[in-house]
Amino acid sequence: MAERSALMQGTVVASHGRHCVVETPDGQRRICHPRGKKSHAVVGDHVMWQAAPQGQGDEGTIEKVLERRNLFYRQDEIRTKSFAANIDQVLILIAAEPVFSESQLARALITAEATHITPLIALNKSDLVEPFARAWERLQPYR
């Protein structure tokens, strides 16, 4: 039976369905799978992971998600989807055209406030003079 390696610390830098990419403190990246059926690790999570036994591939297993400073999520009527942890700021990118959804903007701002993450609203497509001016005016209450 192959011997398991010691637990190592890393940060999740990408998440793709049932696997994550974990970066080690020295900058190496390793594909890791969650232990168990449900993955609770999201980008930004600090995790404890374990490499596969020697001779059984280069991937690893996420054994534990460490305590989070915050968790950014998206919520609708049906479910909540977590997608980033331990972040300092969230950029909310709004397009001048098509017309942006104020309810989506409000949900993002409420989530940022609830999780103590500084929001930054950016208005895109400034080359579209009239739509940009209308969108800029609609953003007045958020300044």
Where are these regions (language model features)?
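N-terminal accessory targeting/assembly segments
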Residues: 1-102
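Short histidine/acidic/glycine/proline-rich micro-motifs that form metal-
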Residues: 96-99, 125-129
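Histidine-anchored nucleotide/phosphate-binding helix
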Residues: 104-114, 118
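Short glycine-/polar-rich loops that comprise or flank the Walker A/P-loop
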Residues: 86-89, 115-119
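Canonical P-loop GTPase G-domain recognition
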Residues: 118, 127-143
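Structural beta-sheet core signal
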Residues: 92, 121-123
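Residue-level signal for inorganic ion chemistry
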Residues: 44, 112, 124
